[in-house]
Amino acid sequence: MNAYLSDQPVRLSPLRDEQGNQPRFGLLLEPGRPGMHVGELPAQWLKGLARSHHLLLLRGFAAFADAESLTRYCHDFGEVMLWPFGAVLELVEQEGAEDHIFANNYVPLHWDGMYLETVPEFQVFHCVDAPGDSDGGRTTFSSTPAALQLADSSELELWRRASGRYQRSAAHYSSRSAAPIVERHPRREFPILRFCEPPVEGDASFINPSEFHYDGIAPEQRGELLASLRRCLYHPQAHYAHRWRSDDLVIADNLTLLHGREAFAHRAPRHLRR
């Protein structure tokens, strides 16, 4: 379908994965004329779409020349959080990385701001340079409401009893976080999941993992908890893996989704700004 903004059409269609499957969330926006800039789309309109569809992919638009212009754009969405590294995180592989975020490791599912007092409502990703199709590095998103809908009654009962405690020391912070696995959206009250996924057990190559503890369940139920969460969060109806193209802009509902990253080839030209 088309939406008309300032007499210029924007094409809207459901987001689909590379196999053509349509998850229960996500919307693709494409320009209706050549050279249309992302900044021509009203931020309030995009925020409404993001709250309804949880993940927006803006593809084919002219985008941002630098981090400063991306930051100015993001101010239209609300207050921009200032992290220890500034407003924009440059996600690019670093030689001798001391944290998995800056390596070419996979990154398990998590939510941003989990160690902060205020969790940002939205994330904005801009792809400066995309890796090759065979290089890996897709960003993964999982809808927690969809996962809750996919769970059976015994899984839901287990999730509702469980809570997670996490501790992490990274380049920019060291902190602890605790949250029940099943929680209410902080603004809209519907159920969501708050889950920080551990890395693959026994993976010695994973750089600087967090510490993970789960309360409210018996120790022998930890494996069942993790397996059931992964089953639902990685179900095709709840999960989307995004292969980047240069100048893609992705707006994610950070209060509703979890996100992560697939591993990518060493020195692949993968550069995102978030």
Q: What function would you assign to each model-found segment?
A:
Residues 69:
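Classical protein tyrosine phosphatase
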Residues 72-75:
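Short Gly/aromatic-enriched secondary-structure transition segments
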Residues 60-62:
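Structural motif
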